[in-house]
Amino acid sequence: MYKVRISGIGCCLVDRIYDRVDFQSELFGKYLSKKAGDGGLEPGKLTFEEELEHFSGDGFLAKILPQLTEGRDPQIESIGVPCVVALINAAQLAWRESEVCFYGCRGDDGVGEDLLQKLQQTNLDLSHYRIQEGSETASTSVLSDPNFDNGHGERTFVNTIGASWHYLPEEVDASFYDSEICVFSGTALVPRIHQGLSTMLRKAKEHGSITIVNTVYDFLNQKKNPEQRWPMGDCD
C-alpha cells in the first residue's frame, strides 16, 4: 500500500510546567519586562533564558526559577511545541496511510535521551532527528498563574534554545523535500531554519510538495522590531 510521506521540521523540546506562580507578586515584578523585547518576563509571551539573564543579571536555573516556583519541581514534563506534537497526532490518526518523519535536533545530554525514549513510543520516523554534540536539549519552563486576569489564568514562557541554535538548513537532506507534505512549525525556536524559511519553502514547492507553516512566538524578531509584525522568511 502506498503511503503519503509527511515531513516536518521545527523545534522539539521538553515542556516543564510550573503551576501556582504568582504574576502579581513583588518577586515576579522584579523580572517583569519594562519595554517590548527587552528580555524580561511578560504574561502570555516568551523570552529566551539568556535574554532574561542579561535583563536581570541573575541566573535563571540558579536563582530566578527557584524563587518564582518556591523551589517546587515541575508539575508536568512533556514533549512540547507545535511541530513534533502535530506530527505525532498525524502519525496516530493516519498511520495506515502515511509515513510521518521529523527533522530536528537534540543535545547529547540526559534530557535528550529521555526525550528520544518518549518519541520512540510514537509512530514517528526519527531517522533524521540529529544529535548536536556539546549542546543541551531545548526546553521551555512554562510558568502558570491560574488566578491572573481575574481568574482567566495565563502562562509565561522561558525558552532554553540549546541545540536548536546550531541546526542549519544545509543539514536537511533531499528526503525532506521529496515529501508530499512539508510542515514548517515553530521554526522561530530554531533560528537558522527560520532565517532560511523562504529558500526551504521554495525548494519544497519546486518538488511539488504541499507546504504548511505554523507559527510560534518569535522573540528574536520581537526584540529586533518590537513595533513591527514578525516577518516570515526573507521575502516577507
Regions found by a protein language model. Name each.
Residues 130-131, 140-191:
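Conserved phosphate-binding/catalytic loop of the ribokinase/pfkB sugar-kinase fold
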Residues 109-122, 142-148, 156:
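Active-site-proximal loop->helix
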Residues 1-101, 110-114:
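Glycine-rich phosphate/adenosyl-contacting loop at the front of the ribokinase-like
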Residues 100, 126, 211-213:
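Hydrophobic beta-strand scaffold residues
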Residues 118-135:
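A glycine-rich helix N-cap at a beta->alpha junction
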Residues 181-236:
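Conserved beta-alpha-beta core of the PfkB/ribokinase-like small-molecule kinase fold
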Residues 9-11, 104-108, 131, 144-146, ...:
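Cofactor-binding loop segments of dinucleotide-utilizing enzymes, especially the Rossmann-like FAD-
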Residues 91, 120, 202-206:
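Anion (oxyanion) recognition and catalysis
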